Amino acid sequence: NMTDEEYFKRGQYTKQNGKMTTLTTDVALNYSKTWNEKHVLFANTQWSLGETKSESVTFQAEGFANDKLDYITHAQQYLEGGKPSGSESVSRETSILASVNYSYDSRYLFDGNYRANASSLFGADKRWGHFWSLGIGWNIHNESFMQDFGWLQRLKLRASTGYTGSQNFNSYQAISTYKYYSDEVYDNIIGSYLMSLANPDLQWQKTQDNNVGLDLSIFGRVDLTFDYYIKNTSNLLTPVTLPPSAGFSSYTENLGKSQNKGFELQASVRAINNSDQDLHLNVFASLMHNTNKIKEINEALSSMNDSKDSDKGLNYDQNTKEKTTKPSVRYAEGQSMSAIWAVRSLGIDPGTGNELFLTKDGYLTYTWDSDDQIVCGDELPKYTGTFGFNLDWKGFSVNTSFYYRLGGQMYNQTLVDKVENCDMNYNVDHRVYTGRWTTPGQKAEFKKMTDPNYFTRPTSRFVQDLSELQMTSLNIGYDFRNCKFMQKGIIERLKLSFYMNDVFRLSTVKTERGTDYPFARSFSFQLQATF
């Protein structure tokens, strides 16, 4: 039975209001000139100033007479013991830009750019970043000695080098922030506590992008683009995870230097272009390869690696706020930023049912040791790309897009959590009983339940090669343009189409995909009519 006071407090209502305001000012000055019908010059200078402000306020009320009176004004009172909460953030940025573009006879091209940016997101003495770029190009197909090659429509060589900056993090990462307790007063002073650590040395992440490329068009059907790049990043912006004892979950710091290099190849072919038969088919594909290497780390990052060694393979998960046996992110010079660190495993010992490990020095042991972790894989794929086609025939159209990745590895945490580290008080995977070691001499995929290393720490046994193929989109349609009733002039255009994304996925690794984006499959039908 409820008391009168409890009865009139039934039901709660939470209301949140938020808004974001962006103000920008841009002033630009352009100059262009053409002379002797061969020289083309364009120059530009620009100044910009901007501010982005966001704020949100949340409050709760309670006490509703019935579920029909569900607007907040029908509440009896604010939530007992509750008070309004919210957040706000402000970021400001200004920049100065100057650029020059020059072309001679549509054959030789030159680009130069300089940009100075200042952002309030960085430390007080590190707010300005200076970036420049230079590029050259040569349209070989416009040379006189190439005019006899009628099958060649475009042949262009290009090269560029320059710097870009990144500030991809939230406001107030460079300064200390506090929360005040308006209801806690001592000696007429309200209480407060430190919410985040200051980092006055936080500065722009800079990437030097060196690129050479080729553009080719031949036979009026085939287009090819090739790029080779080397990207050197300094002052690498990285969120550093802290142990719970620090009082903060993470902070942002410039932690070192890294290098990415690789190539990108894109091709498209107009395979069929028959207007008489109203048949058109375009095919496209791309291939990308990238390698990543850490060139330098600072002392803070090195200390963070040491602290993870002391965690004995149990890491702090930022999302669940709990300990996890997922391989921790570690940074080591000469290694990839996406390297998978684990202890090498020789599998399950048929005689004992325990996992047999290989130490860093090559000795056999049944004991998992954090000091024996080495790089056992890399999440970065060796090759990635897309392909697909666009077909149109007498009003029918089919457009498809596929994504593929070849090579690289992943740590199959699903097997770890659902089989070896499962909670026996709940429903479990059948492999907990069918796949584990039970009797001497048995060859098993999973260790025995009474293994002294109860929790399975990062081990190469769960590092698996990952290749996959996804059909990312399918669009089927019919345009009624050729139908007789369209000739009456009442309807100008009528088209029916069906769209589906994430059609299927084939993978060499079986694991839980979850329900979060980007794995939300959607279907849509559309009817377009123009009268």
Task: Locate predicted features.
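Extracellular/periplasmic, surface-exposed regions of secreted and cell-surface proteins
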Residues: 1-3, 7-320, 458-531
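Transmembrane alpha-helix/helix-exit interface in multi-pass inner-membrane proteins
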Residues: 401-403
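Extracytoplasmic gating/loop element in the C-terminal half of outer-membrane beta-barrel translocons
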Residues: 119, 350, 405-494, 500
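Gram-negative outer-membrane beta-barrel transporters
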Residues: 256-381, 405-408, 414
